[in-house]
């Protein structure tokens, strides 16, 4: 039976403060729980890409087509809610086209860790409102996949509030090794420009915040169950080397019983996966099925 969802858009996730229009999220909530025990369902949380700087990609247009597919899919009964998080963006560069909405002025001034702080603030807001604990799947595309894995290292940094890590992370066309991204840039000097804008000129920082360089996923993600690495068959921007280096980084973590590291291939180019929605939705659906299989094997 199809699950019916209500869409709430542009919700500020920073309380008692004046939020930027980028510090908002969208939520899709079932109008009623049709599957009984809600403690066995999952929240799906999307993080859009756009090289930390593209105002034409936002929480709504990134997720809305995938959501339409998910609410009519075979796993809709397992979904407790869906969210998509906006975050502040880095400065534009001269080579970047003017966004369709016009000039954004001085509003794009974010630099690491601003993007990450915003994503975590969005997750913490959702946790306070819905209390789903670890029962969520963090799904990021391109730099959104970077941010998804960076939420794990944020736990070890100076933060007054912490959040429960997800049971699963889906990285779609993810950027996992930032120096490697710069070195294999198919459109020089595009990657170098947006990495400078997002992280500054210290390339030691680029390496330190690259998920593929994290040394101990067992310590960073002890409650994790599933890592899904997705690549696009005709990706114009991201080399398969990004997936390969991340798979290698997760190998030891994934050897523990009750965990999986999976790779998926999608047809099409870098942005086609979310623009059509079906690719993004299929990754989530397969991941929910993987998690259910893990639960059965643990029972």
UniProtKB/Swiss-Prot annotation:
UniProt EC number: 3.5.1.-
Name of encoding gene: fscH
Its job: Kynurenine formamidase-like hydrolase; part of the fragmented gene cluster that mediates the biosynthesis of fusarochromene, a tryptophan-derived metabolite closely related to a group of mycotoxins including fusarochromanone. Within the pathway, fscH converts the product of fscD into 4-hydroxykyrunenine. The first step of the pathway is the epimerization of L-tryptophan to D-tryptophan in the presence of the NRPS-like tryptophan epimerase fscC. D-tryptophan is subsequently hydroxylated by the tryptophan 6-hydroxylase fscE to yield 6-hydroxytryptophan.
Motif (HGGXW): 48-52
Molecular function GO terms recorded: hydrolase activity
Entry-linked InterPro entries: AB_hydrolase_fold, GDXG_lipolytic_enzyme
SUPFAM superfamilies listed in its UniProt record: alpha/beta-Hydrolases
Domain statement: The main chain amide nitrogen atoms of the second glycine and its adjacent residue in the HGGXW motif define the oxyanion hole, and stabilize the oxyanion that forms during the nucleophilic attack by the catalytic serine during substrate cleavage.
Listed name of the protein: Kynurenine formamidase-like hydrolase fscH
Active site (UniProt): 142
Family the UniProt entry places it in: Belongs to the kynurenine formamidase family.
Bilayer-spanning residue ranges: none
Species for this entry: Fusarium equiseti (Fusarium scirpi)
Pathway info: Secondary metabolite biosynthesis
Region (Disordered) residue spans: 90-110
Keywords assigned: Hydrolase
